[in-house]
Amino acid sequence: EEGNSQTIATLTGATDNVLYQAASYDFRLLRFRLRGYDSEYTQPTINGVTMNDAARGRFNYSMLGGLNQAFKNKSIGMGLEATAYSFGDVGGANNIATYAKDYAPGTRASVAYTNGNYYLRGMITHATGLNKHGWALTASAAVRYSDQGIVPGSFYNSASLFLSLQKVFNPQHSLSLTAFGAPTSRAANTATYQEIYDLLD
């Protein structure tokens, strides 16, 4: 079924609800569906703009790939609960805020070596904070790489970029520009049978 590869991992840390936390962290690999609803019944937004794919009706989480530090400011609405950014949906609603002034000023960098889909991940994020002229800038970059993952032939190559620029005119008015991208090239593994290989020979 289309959308099976979508998880609710972005809910981690976004709510105090115990079920959401457990489902997001413990069951994400099992493609847990909150309340049994498919991902097309959730309302994901970035800065209040609905981000569901127009053709599939689902949010493409891979476009946020590797930008954990940039997309960490989240709010969750459970079920049909109205939020500051939407009226909600039967599967819930979540908003990711990327306003540059909301990031803590400074630089944060991390490097990780893993044994999963990729074996090397590097991230760096820099935020200026809001200066006296009302400008704020946040930039982030990430790289994930593996010439071969834990399954032979499963390579992974991803580079991600994020930029948020904001001009605050007064406490009620600001203008914000956010741009991001995560071009990824990867191989996926799947279960198969010897019969398939025999048919291909």
Per-region residue spans from a language model:
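Low-complexity, highly charged intrinsically disordered N-terminal segments
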Residues: E2-G3
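Solvent-exposed loop segments that connect transmembrane elements
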Residues: N189-D201
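Structural signature of outer-membrane beta-barrel channels/translocons
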Residues: Y37, G66, A97-K101, G129-N131, ...
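Soluble periplasmic/extracytoplasmic beta-strand elements of cell-envelope proteins
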Residues: R33-R35, Q43-T45, S75, A93-A97, ...
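Extracytoplasmic beta-strand/coil segments of soluble accessory domains associated
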Residues: A9-T50, G79
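Extracytoplasmic
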Residues: L29, S39-Y41, Q69-F71, D89-G91, ...
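Transmembrane beta-barrel wall of Gram-negative outer-membrane proteins
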Residues: R108-S146, I150-N189
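Short acidic/polar hinge/loop motifs at secondary-structure boundaries
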Residues: Y20-A22, V49-L80, N94-Y99, Y103
